[in-house]
Amino acid sequence: MPTINQLVRRPRRPRESANKAPALQHNPQKRAVCVKVYTTTPKKPNSALRKVARVRIAGYGSEVIAYIPGEGHNLQEHSVVLIRGGRVKDLPGVRYHIVRGALDAKGVQGRKKARSKYGVKRGV
């Protein structure tokens, strides 16, 4: 434990919180290119085939795994996508989401509710 004198000379510094989405480099979103599009299984107790893509971030070169939200998608290798932060709790290592309705990722077909989250225009 430091003495009062030591604390006067060098005060305590607050601990910096860890960056949850380091590959975005403090940007809200980044453009990326799909390297591999595949499905993976969640950890216990859940069971499904979750759609994910391994993407290479443009102008940065690092590869991360991003989740493809919604039912059905049109993504394949070399698709250009927009990624945002946000992890998927039951998929270890997936810390990014692909933004639907931006760049090559089309919006979810037939979506009626929560449309803004899935890139769907207001069908009149």
UniProtKB/Swiss-Prot annotation:
It comes from Anaplasma marginale (strain Florida). One of its GO terms (cellular component) is small ribosomal subunit. CDD domains: Ribosomal_S12. With S4 and S5 plays an important role in translational accuracy. Interacts with and stabilizes bases of the 16S rRNA that are involved in tRNA selection in the A site and with the mRNA backbone. Located at the interface of the 30S and 50S subunits, it traverses the body of the 30S subunit contacting proteins on the other side and probably holding the rRNA structure together. The combined cluster of proteins S8, S12 and S17 appears to hold together the shoulder and platform of the 30S subunit. Keywords: Methylation, Ribonucleoprotein, Ribosomal protein, RNA-binding, rRNA-binding, tRNA-binding. Transmembrane segments: none annotated. PROSITE patterns: RIBOSOMAL_S12. GO terms for biological process: translation. GO terms for molecular function: rRNA binding; structural constituent of ribosome; tRNA binding. The modification 3-methylthioaspartic acid is found at residue 90. Residues 1-29 are annotated as: Disordered. Belongs to the universal ribosomal protein uS12 family. It holds the Pfam family Ribosom_S12_S23. This is Small ribosomal subunit protein uS12. Part of the 30S ribosomal subunit. Contacts proteins S8 and S17. May interact with IF1 in the 30S initiation complex. The keyword tRNA-binding applies.
